[in-house]
């Protein structure tokens, strides 16, 4: 089936609240564990080090909070362009502010305009670019121009930075899409069922992502299918692009 773009930002309050209240704990924990596994294998991204980590498209902070809890010595910045989503993330951080001195959320939309880039560079030292680890969960399919994500990686990643991206992958036909919605969202609120279906239709195939990476000069990154609906992109930014 052909790709059908969806809105880039999830900025409806009802939509943001439904997403934040949904139970993604299983997939969120699996992605967090995968990030930590890859970090342990990459020189310069060791989980025991005081790293700068960037979560692109952090939404309400599901992955940001899990990773920050696992890496209290790191500095983690969550970036999102949706005010409604970021407000939920910041509310959760403020509830236990003493627990999260190493976690910060920032409003910014990709591609980063000069004023947003300047705002990042004005953050406290531990949160400024460049970043040793860049992660992203379910952002790519929202972007009408997927090259924006890979351009941002070049813009903000340190030399040899670890990049880990998880996203939905587009089903081959509408029937397969509906089967996934029924399998994974049959009991979800209508707004989540709608958004899940739209997101699956807006997602990319592994082959399309591989072509994006070649065009971006990131052909060394690995693209893998994960379970019945995700794909994973992982790799290190080439040193020669520093």
Language-model segment annotations:
Residues 1-18:
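N-terminal, positively charged/glycine-rich alpha-helical extensions of SAM-dependent methyltransferases
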Residues 25-48:
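Conserved alpha-helix/loop element of class I SAM-dependent methyltransferases that forms part
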Residues 49-57:
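Conserved class I S-adenosyl-L-methionine
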Residues 54, 62-112:
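Class I SAM-dependent methyltransferase SAM/SAH-binding core
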Residues 135:
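A conserved beta-strand element that flanks and buttresses the S-adenosyl-L-methionine
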Residues 150-159:
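A short glycine-rich, Lys/Arg-flanked "PGG" loop and its adjoining helix->strand segment in the class I
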Residues 160-167:
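Conserved beta-strand signature within the Rossmann-like core of class I S-adenosyl-L-methionine
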Residues 168-218, 222-224:
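C-terminal alpha-helical "lid/dimerization" subdomain adjacent to the S-adenosyl-L-methionine
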């Amino acid at each position: 089936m052909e790709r059908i773009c969806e809105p880039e930002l999830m900025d409806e309050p009802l939509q943001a609240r439904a997403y934040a209240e949904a139970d993604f704990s299983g997939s969120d924990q699996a992605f967090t564990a995968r990030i930590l596994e890859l970090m342990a294998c990459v020189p310069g991204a060791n989980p025991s080090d005081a790293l700068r980590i960037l979560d692109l498209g952090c939404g309400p902070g599901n992955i940001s909070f899990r990773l920050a809890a696992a890496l209290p010595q790191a500095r983690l910045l969550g970036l999102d362009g949706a005010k409604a989503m970021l407000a939920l993330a910041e509310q959760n951080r403020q509830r236990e502010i003493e627990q999260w001195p190493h976690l910060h959320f920032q409003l910014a939309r990709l591609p980063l305009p000069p004023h947003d880039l300047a705002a990042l560079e004005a953050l406290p030292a531990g949160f400024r670019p460049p970043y040793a680890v860049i992660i992203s969960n379910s952002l790519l399919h929202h972007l009408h121009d997927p090259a924006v994500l890979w351009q941002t990686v070049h813009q903000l990643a340190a030399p040899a930075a670890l990049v880990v991206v998880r996203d939905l992958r587009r089903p081959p036909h509408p029937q397969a899409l509906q089967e996934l919605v029924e399998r994974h969202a049959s009991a979800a609120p209508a707004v989540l069922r709608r958004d899940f279906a739209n997101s699956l239709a807006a997602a990319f195939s592994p082959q399309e992502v591989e072509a994006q990476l070649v065009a971006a000069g990131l052909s060394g990154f690995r693209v893998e299918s994960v379970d019945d609906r995700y794909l994973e992109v992982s790799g290190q930014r080439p040193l020669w692009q520093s």
